[in-house]
Amino acid sequence: MTEKKTAPSFQFMKDESTSVLGGEWVPMYCTDEPVEFSKGDFETAMLNVIREPNINSTAILRADILAEKFYDLEGNEQELSTDDKPVLSESLPYDADAKLVNIDDITTRKELIENKELELTIVKEFVRRMIPRNPYKDALINQTCLVYNSKKTENKDTSLVLYIPHFEDEADCPFYIPHVQKVAILLHGGILSVHYIPYAGQSEDLRKDNERVVRTAFRLLQTAYKHSKGVMQGYEKRVNHDQVVDRVLFQDTYIQLKKKYSKFLVDNWAESTDPKKHVFEDLAIAAFLLEFWKTQYGDDYKTTMQFRDMGCGNGVLTYILISEGVNGVGIDARKRKSWSIYPTEIQRHLKEQVIIPSILLRPTPDVRRYMPYLEDNGAMFPIKVEDGLIAPATLVYSSADLIASPNVNICEFPDNTFIIGNHSDELTCWIPLLGFPFMVIPCCSHDLSGKKVRFNTRVPKSEKTTPAMKNNIKINSNNVNNSNSTYAGLVNHVEYLAKKVGWKVEKEMLRIPSTRNAAIIGTDNAYAKEFPTPDIYRTIEEEGGALTWVQNTMQLAKASPRNH
């Protein structure tokens, strides 16, 4: 039995006065033994880190690649593949209040490596713009990233990655990058190491392992090692974001929304829950929706569509969307304290109503065909009442009563309505069955009667597919995960229901501070004008019916609000 190889330790090189790179370079950390991954693994990992600098710092939102060139060892420029060509954002995520440092300088900065024994030459060069999460606190900067290889055969496995920020003044160095002039990560002789060129008078600090800049060097080495080994082992991302909405567009909109609304919402939070979690989550969802609607309905979407936020809870999402000029309504069975903090015009768009889909109250299409004058199905719904009575009693509501009640929303909306289900609990499985384009972010598992239930993940068998499912061909295969967890089962079940009644489903793993971040989206259904279709009635029946939905949703109106 072979022993499992342990990872090398990282050695602080404080007693070494000179770097293998020569010149002003100061060695910081290195592995104490040769690494097991190859130069190719290292460069693949580091190219990903160049494009995704948020891997190294949570204060960084992303990097925009402004320039990119590849060369052979003789210095001849190589043609970039389509995937490698940089795509610049037309809109920039900042305004007059944002901090900017020399961002007009997009000229690549070169660095000559003085150690002639290495004979290093540039094979890849990038200029990237670093976008911090808060550009009103941390400055945007440009930075050159260089990849060197050796011309010498004996150093064919040597690779160097070098970072040079586009400013000279030490005072301009933002918090989210190492506080030094230049950074190098070197793979040479199987040893992985990190080196700095310090600012004037900084060399002494680089010998103290409790200094932040020294700890940063350790983390840079740790990240380079971890990600290179991951490439070697064939690691693949479990979650792919940005399948539906472009990442840059989403993040730029998120920055703007956060600046406009976060302080007011956090400072005036009226609930007992953590304001930052809810506020920043809903800001991100709003940013996603605004960009999605723009691609779906066009630039004039604010005048051509409207939304209904079903189970809107604290109303934050509704508040942001309406404030951004989108017409819509937030609906919830219970009014929240937070509703009172919003302007009067927003409060008018927040409705305290129980939601009872009209399919439970209206005659079926077959009945209406023979009796078109009928407005309700004549159903009776007994509701037990105990509060304030001498003895428990039962109220009986008719479907006609519920249709006429201003305290009941029966989901009969204008044709241009888009439905949002943001952690809408009992409503989650109902939303794809209402006949309107939708986005639902599942959270807690309930069936169509409103009862808690656990769904198993499943793939519908071909012999059980409905005509609507056969017509549904646009399925995003991005899975939540492969396990049969309660959440994975719920997400899978919502997708199943949506496809079963004809929706062409897309799925996005939203960039929100929540582990329950799967968004199921349906905008195209060949049967939309025929709702409610036979498939919907059949689906409700196959799901066990919804006989107690009315009773459960009435009880929901009396219960205390849940917090997610």
UniProtKB/Swiss-Prot annotation:
Annotated GO biological processes are: tRNA nucleoside ribose methylation
Q: Which residues form a coiled coil?
A: none
Per UniProt, the enzyme's principal EC class comes to transferase
Gene Ontology cellular component annotations, sorted alphabetically: cytoplasm
Presence of keyword Transcription regulation: no
Q: Where are the transmembrane segments?
A: none
- Reaction catalysis annotation: uridine(44) in tRNA(Ser) + S-adenosyl-L-methionine = 2'-O-methyluridine(44) in tRNA(Ser) + S-adenosyl-L-homocysteine + H(+)
Fetch the Pfam families from UniProt.
AdoMet_MTase (PF07757)
Q: What is its EC number?
A: 2.1.1.211
| Record's subcellular location | Cytoplasm
UniProt keywords (A-Z) are: Cytoplasm, Methyltransferase, S-adenosyl-L-methionine, Transferase, tRNA processing
Q: What is its main location?
A: cytoplasm
A molecular function GO annotation: tRNA(Ser) (uridine(44)-2'-O-)-methyltransferase activity
User: Which function does this protein serve?
Assistant: Probable adenosyl-L-methionine (AdoMet)-dependent tRNA (uracil-O(2)-)-methyltransferase.
Q: Which family does it belong to?
A: Belongs to the TRM44 family.
The protein's name is: tRNA (uracil-O(2)-)-methyltransferase
| Native source organism of the sequence | Candida glabrata (strain ATCC 2001 / BCRC 20586 / JCM 3761 / NBRC 0622 / NRRL Y-65 / CBS 138)
Q: What is the lineage of its organism?
A: Eukaryota, Fungi, Dikarya, Ascomycota, Saccharomycotina
Q: Which gene encodes it?
A: TRM44
